[in-house]
């Protein structure tokens, strides 16, 4: 996407600016790597780990719904709000206890990351976390939270920040690049559509951007590693310093090796479970797959009028024209495109040699979560870190 992307959406199929790189990874290839270059060469002083969808403190919007009902029924407000707060407190720890490092960043992952890089940079899990809900507002809120963190905990003058995120966290990073470019009219429209007045982090970031130059000075200090991020929001090239995508991929067609096997017609179940063509979830989560919670439905419709405004009307063949409703019909056409790569940044399409390790449910790590879970595993972290460091230094 261009400079001054103005919150435009990527297209299906996408048109990568740089040629994707395909390669195979071995779990032991980073054994002798000197990771000090992250600090000495790339000047990274902080690494922020951000989990993806459904791994947050309110992934299905239950707490949000309870709070919305509480506003409408004052007599029950106290009880409902207490229930909501209890859910927010307990959901993330429960999820982490069940998933471990499969599709999720947790404390053992952070500790291993810190061991690899030494005392500098500092490696942090995002705290407080984000909801993990699967819609525009949740990802927009994450982008604002990340920006707000930089306001309340500024980087040192000579430091850069590496954002290291999984799945739709990467799409929050994309929104952040549009915010950092700070095209005043489109940023104002973004805040108006989100309608989050009264939320401290939203108010603080909006006020700050209104007073800041364009692009924001922080833009040149943001490096991004996006793992398994679905192709959604456009990246603004004035809103970051460097960007690399790491996606589990196995080519299906030698004539178009960077495309994935189209998800429509559907894959055979065994091919999905065994990640025969790589990360199925990353290819699945295109525009049209969001799920709004009850309290966010209207706001998400408003945000879609900005964030999906440039998605074209789609032409349908015999295989899709009778599918109802229109949203599903259009999503099927997008799945047919086999879109794997992002328009901007360096797309690293990686296949994994089997490590021999198994997930808690007995699946090979490389097949976990339909090929989506390997990106966050401690076992593959050294190799992933070497891959990212080398790419950022190109």
Where would I find each of the regions flagged by the language model?
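Serine-dependent carboxylesterase/thioesterase catalytic core
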Residues: 136-273
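Extended, compositionally biased low-complexity polar/Lys-Gly-rich tracts
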Residues: 102-113, 122-129, 215-236, 342-345
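Active-site catalytic motif of lipid deacylating hydrolases and related acyltransferases
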Residues: 48-159
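A generic short-segment signal for beta-strand/edge and adjacent turn/coil regions
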Residues: 12-18, 94-96, 191-194, 209-216, ...
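C-terminal catalytic-base region of ester-bond hydrolases, centering on the histidine
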Residues: 76-80, 93-103, 237-394
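N-terminal low-complexity, Ser/Thr- and acidic-residue-enriched intrinsically disordered segments
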Residues: 2-81
């Amino acid at each position: 996407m261009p400079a001054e992307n103005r919150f435009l959406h990527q297209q299906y199929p996408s048109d990568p600016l740089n040629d994707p790189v395909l390669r195979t990874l071995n779990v032991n290839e980073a054994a002798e790597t000197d990771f000090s270059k992250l600090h000495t060469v790339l000047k990274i002083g902080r690494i922020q780990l951000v989990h993806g969808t459904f791994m947050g403190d309110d992934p299905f919007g239950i707490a949000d719904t309870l709070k919305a009902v509480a506003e409408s029924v004052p007599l029950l407000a106290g009880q409902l709000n207490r229930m909501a707060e209890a859910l927010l407190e307990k959901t993330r720890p429960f999820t982490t206890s069940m998933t471990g490092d499969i599709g999720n960043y947790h404390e053992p992952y952070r500790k291993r990351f810190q061991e690899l890089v030494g005392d500098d940079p500092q490696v942090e899990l995002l705290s407080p976390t984000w909801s993990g809900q699967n819609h525009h507002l949740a990802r927009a809120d994450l982008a604002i939270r990340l920006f707000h963190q930089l306001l309340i905990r500024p980087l040192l003058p000579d430091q850069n920040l590496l954002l290291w995120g999984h799945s739709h966290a990467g799409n929050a990073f994309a929104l952040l690049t549009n915010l950092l470019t700070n095209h005043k009219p489109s940023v104002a429209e973004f805040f108006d559509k989100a309608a989050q007045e009264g939320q401290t982090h939203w108010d603080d970031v909006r006020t700050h951007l209104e007073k800041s130059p364009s692009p924001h000075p922080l833009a040149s200090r943001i490096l991004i590693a996006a793992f398994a991020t679905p192709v959604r929001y456009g990246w603004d090239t004035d809103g970051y310093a460097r960007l690399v995508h790491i996606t589990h991929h196995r080519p299906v067609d030698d004539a178009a090796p960077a495309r994935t096997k189209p998800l429509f017609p559907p894959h055979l179940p065994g091919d999905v479970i065994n990640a025969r063509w790589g990360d199925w979830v990353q290819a699945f989560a295109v525009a049209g797959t969001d799920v709004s919670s009850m309290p966010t439905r209207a706001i998400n419709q408003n945000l879609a009028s900005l964030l999906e405004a440039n998605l074209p009307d789609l032409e349908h063949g015999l295989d899709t024209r009778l599918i109802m409703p229109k949203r599903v019909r259009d999503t099927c056409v997008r799945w047919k495109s086999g879109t794997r790569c992002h328009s901007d940044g360096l797309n690293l399409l990686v296949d994994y040699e089997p490590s021999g390790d198994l997930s808690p449910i007995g699946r090979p790590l490389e097949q976990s979560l339909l090929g989506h879970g390997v990106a966050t595993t401690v076992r593959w972290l050294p190799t992933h870190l070497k891959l990212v460091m080398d790419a950022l230094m190109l």
